Amino acid sequence: MSFELLATDGKARRGRITFPRGTVETPAFMPVGTYGTVKGMLPRDIEAIGAEMILGNTFHLWLRPGTEVIKKHNGLHDFMQWKGPILTDSGGFQVFSLGAMRKIKEEGVTFASPVDGSKVFMGPEESMQVQRDLGSDVVMIFDECTPYPAEHDVARTSMELSLRWAQRSKNAHADNTAALFGIVQGGMYQDLRMRSLEGLENIGFDGLAIGGLSVGEPKHEMIKVLDYLPDQMPADKPRYLMGVGKPEDLVEGVRRGVDMFDCVMPTRNARNGHLFVDTGVIKIRNAFHRHDESPLDPTCDCYTCTNFSRAYLHHLDKCGEMLSSMLNTIHNLRHYQRLMAGLREAIQQGKLAAFVDAFYAKRGLPVPPLD
């Protein structure tokens, strides 16, 4: 993997990540394919909406169908028939999400499988082996996602454990030719975040991610971290904000120097009939769309908007048709890709401020200040 910085506008960066399987223009949004599929999307649909890289979930694929099945297909790419780069998360966040079902020790985490209730163990070495078996292009270290809220001592202990696991992840990654990303933890505490970053830089990674955000903290707490952290991360490596978020969050992350994003929001919201447009969100389930012959978004070039009316999308949603989720997902993911393309072009032209002004004006919102 190589990263090239092509342009900057303030803290915002326009770059390109090159993998043997293809290039990813940044800032980039990666659709989430938890079980080896982006829900409701064929691989050709994912390509058609402009996504260049997707995310796979190590934890869930390890439990189901199991790496022994995926290895027979020579890895996740052939298994799911996606030709572009894949980033796999380490499973740390999913283990964190299990709450009382898990027990964390120095060696790793023991938990009850959400599939069949059996006792399962995962540590850094296991996570690295699973990701090696999946054949992902970007491997994430195994870490503990610091909960919110957390007292300073709790956040410090969690961060220090994650650093030790980061070193073990690096050791276990060994001769794997895939890129390995570290994850900055430390909760909402700047001193802990900076210690985490320093420790990860000393270990040495191909890219760095910001973890432990969008875990229940207020928006202003997340922004506070983004105000200082990305700018302190190495300029010659990709910066990845994990699990975030809304279109506004992507814009604010880009303004502060983030290069990569992922989130289930566009796909999950699509299945609930919440569709993103430049002015905000359209709830296609609402009755007043029943007779609306206009496209969902006349400015959008996706298959959904160029072929179907709001009335048809409303009808499919009310009937619970499978096609409803599929068409909604195509639109939402294309909306996110168009947003990222607009941000890239604005940075390239040195016109990000004007782009951001227009973005918030369409939503009737003030532009948030930059620290």
Swiss-Prot record:
Give the residue ranges for region: RNA binding: 243-249, 267-271
The question of whether ATP-binding is a record keyword is answered with: no
Keyword flag Glycosyltransferase: yes
Question: Which residues participate in Zn(2+) binding?
Answer: C300, C302, C305, H331
Pfam families cross-referenced by the UniProt entry: TGT
InterPro entries this protein is in? ArchSynthase1/Queuine_TRR, TGT, TGT-like_sf, tRNA_ribo_trans-like
Binding positions for substrate per the UniProt entry: D89, S90, G91, G92, F93, D143, Q185, G212
Q: Per its Swiss-Prot or TrEMBL entry, what cofactor is needed? A: Zn(2+)
Where are the active-site residues found? D89, D262
**Record-level Gene Ontology MF annotations:** metal ion binding; tRNA-guanosine(34) queuine transglycosylase activity
Which terms in the GO cellular component ontology are assigned? Answer: cytosol
Q: Which NCBIfam families match?
A: Q_tRNA_tgt, tgt_general
Q: Sorted alphabetically, which PANTHER family does this protein's record hold?
A: QUEUINE TRNA-RIBOSYLTRANSFERASE
Subunit details: Homodimer. Within each dimer, one monomer is responsible for RNA recognition and catalysis, while the other monomer binds to the replacement base PreQ1.
This chain belongs to the protein called Queuine tRNA-ribosyltransferase
Gene behind this protein: tgt
